[in-house]
């Protein structure tokens, strides 16, 4: 089941990636930390697999973390934050990290996440703060049962 969940999650993420650029202006210049200067060499598919294979997330929590991550991702879209080839790795790794901190009983520290994701501890801390600000400090985004069901159906 876990492998199937990850594959479906990857398919969902691939359908969310767009060529649309995130427009940076005075109101949202904090998003710069979420955008890579250069397109990462590792594909988003391999990057997601690496995160889930690392055992940093308990396998029994995969589904909950995936659903929570997709929910947060949908909320970010309403803020004009999209996944593209320069932002997907940073946004997804940070959203998965935030989701694991909510779901996992004993989540790993940011140092472990930084090492796994190939960024500095300072960068992961900045990305975490940025996403929390963009999410209006609300990691428990409340959605209707129908919206939750739609997200679940889109993945599974």
Predicted regions and their residues:
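Alpha-helical bundle/repeat cores within regulatory domains of eukaryotic proteins
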Residues: 88-94, 99, 103-121, 128, ...
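Acidic, Ser/Thr/Pro-rich regulatory low-complexity segments at or just upstream of the first helical elements
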Residues: 1-86, 114, 125, 129, ...
């Amino acid at each position: 089941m876990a492998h199937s969940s990850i594959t479906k999650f990857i398919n969902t993420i691939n359908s969310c990636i767009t060529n649309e650029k995130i427009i940076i202006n005075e109101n949202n210049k904090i998003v710069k930390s979420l955008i890579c200067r250069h397109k990462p060499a590792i594909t988003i598919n391999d990057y997601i697999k690496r995160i889930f294979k690392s055992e940093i997330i308990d396998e029994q929590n995969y589904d909950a973390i995936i659903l929570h991550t997709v929910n947060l991702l949908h909320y970010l879209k309403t803020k004009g934050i999209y996944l593209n080839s320069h932002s997907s790795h940073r946004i997804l790794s940070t959203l998965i990290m935030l989701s694991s901190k909510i779901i996992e009983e004993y989540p790993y520290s940011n140092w472990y996440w930084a090492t796994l994701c190939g960024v500095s501890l300072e960068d992961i801390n900045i990305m975490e703060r940025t996403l929390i600000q963009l999410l209006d400090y609300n990691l428990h985004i409340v959605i209707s049962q129908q919206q939750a069901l739609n997200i679940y159906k889109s993945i599974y």
